[in-house]
Amino acid sequence: MTTRSGRLAIPLAAAFAVTALGAGTALAQDEPAYAGLDKDLSGTTIKMAAIGGGSYEAMYDSISMFEEQTGANVEIVFLGDGFEIDRYLKTNYAAGTVDFDVAWNHTSFMSQFTNFVEPLQGYFSEEELAAFSPSIIEAATIDGNLQLIPRHADISALYYRTDLYGDADLQAAFEEQYGYPLAVPETLDQMNDHAEFFVAEEAIRFGTQFAGREEALAGRFYELLFANGGDYFDADLKPIFDSEAGVAAATWMQDLYANGLLPGDTPTLLWDGVAANFCNGDVAVYLEWYGWYGYFQDPESCPNVAGKFGMARGPVGLDAETHTGWAGAHAFSVAKDSQNKEAAVELVKFLTSEAVSFEESNTFGFLPVRADVSERVVAANADTGNPLDAERWELANLQVSEDFRTPPLFADWISFTNEWYPTLQAIILGDTSVEDGLAKGVADAADLLDSLGY
């Protein structure tokens, strides 16, 4: 496998090493099965534009097995984080300069790519598709066309430092000051109190945090918005986030920054940055993706927090019945302009197979999108010595079944977030008032959607 991209190379992940033990699609009867290995693709080069960063890249180490058993050569022509790959794909799709066969996709981004990806329902049997989450397959089918095959799902959960929440002295001091017991926060107000308390007690550097730019910021605001009973748009795509819920969400963010409870460089942070802060032991409690679990639990990568954190359901806001739960699924698509569609599909089948998916989910904590993989990871983590290894899967099942909420599914979601997030940054920094910033955001969104023909 070769790589040419903005990165030097794909880092090898020993934990994901996959050894080719035979040419069949399964290692043994009781082993998870591979797929996409039964065709001779000798002489075929499959080019791939992929998401990278964090734990995303480890899966690609398994591609050597695919190459060995099919005879194909896989070339990763671009590797970047979610926002970099999104920009790369949009640029090349729009310019007609597609030089890849397999491309990253995501349920939150897919609406903008519908004209550029190959409908996949004709390449997968009903039995093959039945292995995947029906709700994700349904959500990924637009006008009868299956846009993608899911790789893994994710939903934001509450990560918190158990050593802080379990400290008897801190518990006593908190209850004396705030009048209620220190426990895992169930509301956004409690989360604010805890952030304030831990920083004031000099128990931690930052009380909480969130990614502070691009869709990462707009998405985090979105889950605060719906936890407070609001939404970005009504059923007719009219922007409505200058509501009571919007004021509550924006005020929560602004107050945290004004009170010094967030990192000072919040407006520059994306996913890797906030994960690094928690890994370094600098953050008490925050909303984060399941996909970082394995990284945080690794004493070599994160010695300051490994074994010292817990996970919980996201808090509620003004709407006491609605928890945070921004969610989505990473996936693979085949470019409509690909000259090797059949071979590209085989690579997608391999990368989303039971065996590859199990290794990724079990090693790094990504949420499975296949029922067979879900069963395997639950069994594999039943008796690891760390109760959280198993408890997180029970929590994930609860959140996915009750709290799973994707962003508005329209083609220009990213165009909207690009328009909105600088204004949201200004609100957080105190450069504009909450009310004025929300009014501007709604007006700008209305103008944008009008100009785009909505």
Residue ranges and their predicted role:
Residues 32-37, 54-73, 420, 438:
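Short, polar/charged alpha-helical segment
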Residues 29-40, 103-159, 166, 189-192, ...:
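Hinge/lid segment of periplasmic solute-binding proteins
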Residues 68, 75, 125-126, 141-217, ...:
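Helix-loop-helix "hinge/cap" segment bordering the ligand-binding cleft or interdomain interface
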Residues 34, 309-316, 362-422, 426, ...:
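Long, aromatic- and glycine/proline-rich binding clefts that accommodate carbohydrate-like moieties
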Residues 64-135, 139-141, 145-149, 168-169, ...:
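Extracytoplasmic "Venus flytrap"/periplasmic binding protein-like
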Residues 110, 219-228, 248-340, 346:
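Extracytoplasmic/periplasmic substrate-binding proteins
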Residues 58, 166, 202-203, 348-374:
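Periplasmic-binding protein-like
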Residues 33-34, 38-61, 215, 407-412:
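Extracytoplasmic "Venus flytrap"
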